[in-house]
A protein has these predicted regions:
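General structural signal for secondary-structure boundaries
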Residues: 49, 62, 101-102, 133
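Catalytic metal-binding/acid-base residues of hydrolase active sites
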Residues: 37, 95, 123-124
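Alpha-helix N-cap/helix-start motif
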Residues: 45, 99, 127-130
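Short, low-complexity, polar/charged sequence segments that are solvent-exposed and flexible
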Residues: 50-57, 96-97, 108-111, 138-139
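Glycine-centered flexibility motif
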Residues: 23, 39, 61, 88-89, ...
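Divalent-metal coordination cores built from histidine and acidic residues
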Residues: 2-14, 104-142
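N-terminal metal-binding scaffold of metallo-dependent hydrolase/deaminase domains
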Residues: 1-71
Length: 142
């Protein structure tokens, strides 16, 4: 059992985001006037807004839809001035210890190149340092 960090309950998070999408809960922030790169359709979606709550994207809507749900004084609205927003890249398999740098340093380098998610296989440090190595790596990556 890992006790040093907690993961939000998926069911509670889903209910919360559903309530945001339905206008029952005010999102933490809304990004307006966005152009969004769709990697599914290879197109740019224009005049969109993104509702964000608890660090997650709740939904993407047409620009100014939030005015139909919320008083604009109740929500933080940021105009992204028609900048193109794109999803982050995902590194699906890597070994931080093989890179010869710490997890924190690796994350900084990856972010500079657009990678926002990394799945790390930690068997090497686990084989050498057992659970102490895994705990150290988790702590370093925070």
């Amino acid at each position: 059992m890992i006790t040093r960090f907690s993961v939000p309950n998926l069911h509670e998070t889903t209910i919360h985001l559903t309530n945001v999408v339905n206008g029952k809960i005010v999102p933490d922030k809304i990004l307006t006037n966005a152009k969004i790169l769709s990697t599914y359709t290879d197109t740019i979606l224009e005049n969109k807004e993104i509702w964000i709550s608890k660090g997650r994207i709740a939904c993407i809507r047409n620009n100014n839809d939030h005015k139909n749900f919320f008083n604009t004084k109740d929500v933080s609205v940021f105009d992204v001035e028609k900048n193109i927003l794109a999803p982050g890249l995902i590194d699906p398999h890597m070994h931080i210890e093989s890179s010869m740098i710490t997890g924190c340093a690796y994350a900084e380098a990856a972010l500079l190149n657009g990678t926002t998610t990394i799945f790390c296989d930690s068997h090497e440090i686990g084989n050498v340092l057992d659970t102490d190595g895994i705990e150290w790596m988790l702590e370093d990556c925070r």
